[in-house]
Amino acid sequence: MSMAYLAQPEQQQNLEWLDGGTLAMLLDGKATDGQLMIGRFDVAEGEAPPYHKHTREDEVFLLIKGTALVWCDDQEYELAEGGVVYLPRNIPHGYRITSKRADLLMINTPAGIEGMFRETGRDKSTPRPPGFEVKPDPGLAAKYGNVIVGPPR
């Protein structure tokens, strides 16, 4: 049964992500009865995940602040501040942040992919182990229905 859910900033989990960025987990499947996951990235210039596709969920990116290059099915696009991208499942995609910093909202439906982010990243409320680095893991990605198609672009 679905219920309304309110998550104040202090209730949101913050994960260390690629290249020292932060992923704030705004809503997850537990909060939305599996319907969707919403995360917000604070990342620096050059941050780029591997070129990949999702087999279980559709994805929307809203670039709140900053600029990026986006690749969708091998087509390259420039995404300006305020731009939005819809990525249906099974469409290979990737991005690279081209501004000094970027604020990127990500919505996935249905939920589930947050498990990959939690297993790959590090909860920033815990001590940082010496030498810790977020590294994409193809096996872990596959566990959550993601297929790494190639290196970051």
Describe the function of each predicted region:
Residues 1-36, 122, 127-153:
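A short, N-terminal "cap"/entry segment at the start of jelly-roll beta-barrel domains
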Residues 25, 39-54:
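Conserved short histidine dyad/triad with adjacent acidic residue
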Residues 56-58, 62-68, 73:
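Glycine- and acidic-residue-biased ligand/ion/polar-headgroup-sensing regions
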Residues 32, 89-114:
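Ligand-binding loop in jelly-roll beta-barrel domains
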Residues 47, 55, 67-68, 118:
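Hydrophobic small-molecule pocket/channel-lining residues, especially in calycin-type beta-barrels
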Residues 8, 74-92:
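Short acidic-glycine-tyrosine-enriched beta hairpin
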Residues 39, 64-65, 80-81:
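A cytosolic small-molecule/anion-sensing beta-strand core signal
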